Amino acid sequence: MAAEGWIWRWGWGRRCLGRPGLPGPGPGPATPLFLLLLLGPVVADITDGNSEHLKREHSLIKPYQGVGSSSMPLWDFQGSTILTSQYVRLTPDERSKEGSIWNHQPCFLKDWEMHVHFKVHGTGKKNLHGDGIALWYTRDRLVPGPVFGSKDNFHGLAIFLDTYPNDETTERVFPYISVMVNNGSLSYDHSKDGRWTELAGCTADFRNRDHDTFLAVRYSRGRLTVMTDLEDKNEWKNCIDITGVRLPTGYYFGASAGTGDLSDNHDIISMKLFQLMVEHTPDEENIDWTKIEPSVNFLKSPKDNVDDPTGNFRSGPLTGWRVFLLLLCALLGIIVCAVVGAVVFQKRQERNKRFY
């Protein structure tokens, strides 16, 4: 279970993802309780437990190869992207720039964990900067477009690190991290900051920090988890946790960024992909994972994307069945009112006839 990259930190009451310098893998969920009691707080480094599961063919790690050239092994970049010895800059702090970097190799892992070391910084004051970074696991790569420098109506997974509130009516606090799964039928609405297609999100103060900022994305057996380390405390903080997510294998990892009238430097320092050693049922093993359509078993109604100041959504979202039942009850109510009204009207007419 060490390779799963999780630990139950004794006394914390929550699980944390591991990365170098952070608490790493410990006893997994299947570990007997008496062993947990005997072992107590087991803490290790992910580089010890997971180094052999780092997938270098899908990872971007310093020292970079190809500095000063227009290409590098295993990765392609386009647009305004520049490669330096310290970082990959997707966009400079200039207006109307787009850039991206994409892995050469399609990923055929069913269970994985991506750690991203990034930095968003610039000279713009509050709400005078933009637009943010997008992290991708998608069917198509190197296709520029309006969604943080990449294409709209994509197939796959996107994690948006949005720094500018386009919707002036929103109460959410920016910067904001959100998740979207798409089968090509959905369009990202910048004017609403993607609220209509967002699965979940959280406020995350990652811009212009004086220390390193990290994000971790974990996908395993239909569960998608996003965590952040933004406070220089070597601790992961929960951001997003969704179940029922279906993603195919054979898609590509990438990162992109875009600026408009407002701008920022958008830098990627590293992207490290770890393979998670997870047991699957025989039925799951027999599935052709390359043919799976990106989907989520549970999608929120857009009306449920009503923010509170903390960036959380109200509970009790309206599913399709709930909307149907609500409309059915409303229709029945109208029919009952109409019938009662007709009966009352008829009785009044009969009463009036008797008087004449």
UniProtKB/Swiss-Prot annotation:
Cofactor(s), names only, from the UniProt record: Ca(2+)
Residues covered by the L-type lectin-like domain: 52-276
A GO BP annotation: positive regulation of phagocytosis
Main location, first listed in the record: Golgi
Expression across tissues: Expressed in kidney, liver, intestine, lung, spleen and heart. Low expression in brain.
Membrane topology recorded in Swiss-Prot or TrEMBL: Single-pass type I membrane protein
Name of a matching Pfam family: Lectin_leg-like
Glycan attachment residues as annotated in the record: 183
Signal peptide (residue range): 1-44
Cofactor note: Binds 2 calcium ions per subunit.
GO molecular function per UniProt: D-mannose binding; heat shock protein binding; metal ion binding
Protein name: Vesicular integral-membrane protein VIP36
High-level lineage: Eukaryota, Metazoa, Chordata, Craniata, Vertebrata
